[in-house]
Amino acid sequence: MSTEFQEQIYRHTTASCTRSWRERRGRYLLEGTRCKECGAVHFPRRTVCSTCNSRNLEHCQHPATGTIVMVNICWQATGVHFGYGENIPRISTVIRLDDGVTILAEVTDTELDKIVAGARVEMVLKKLHRESNSTWMYGYKFVVIEGGELGDGE
């Protein structure tokens, strides 16, 4: 087994295979739902619209590009994030996708000075962590494709 991605903390839990299968389209394709009654879009997928309480929803794929709204850089390793190894700093951002949906996601493979509010980002598929049964969990992160600063009022 390769030691390229060694874990610092042993994971005592493993994600449910059934749950992982059910959530795969959201995790890998940014698939959410759109309400057929009021047109509201949601991510992750929902069974009931949070705007009008309708159950008449359809699956929709959100765009893989968006704009950073807010940035949080964590320089301290915390015990809450088991299985993430030495990924310091952890850069969490609030991203508004091009269709208006807002999500929380990490930014990776980008110089710190380019991770600012208003920067354009694009989704990439990355290894997140290794489960206790030695399988890899994949998911989405974002990389900066254009710099920028939000103007006043954003």
Name these PLM-found stretches.
Residues 34-37, 48-54:
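Short, cysteine/histidine-rich loop/knuckle motifs that typically chelate Zn2+
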Residues 71-76, 128:
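Short, conserved beta-turn/loop elements at beta-strand boundaries and strand-helix junctions
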Residues 109-122:
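Short nucleic-acid-contacting surface segments enriched for D/E, G, S/T with interspersed K/R
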Residues 43, 56-58:
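Short functional micro-motifs and their immediate structural scaffolds
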Residues 126-154:
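OB-fold/S1-family single-stranded nucleic acid-binding modules
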Residues 29-32, 46:
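Residues immediately within or flanking Cys/His clusters that coordinate Zn2+
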Residues 66-69, 107:
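Conserved hydrophobic positions within beta-strands
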Residues 1-30, 139-141:
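A broadly conserved sequence feature marking short terminus-proximal activation segments
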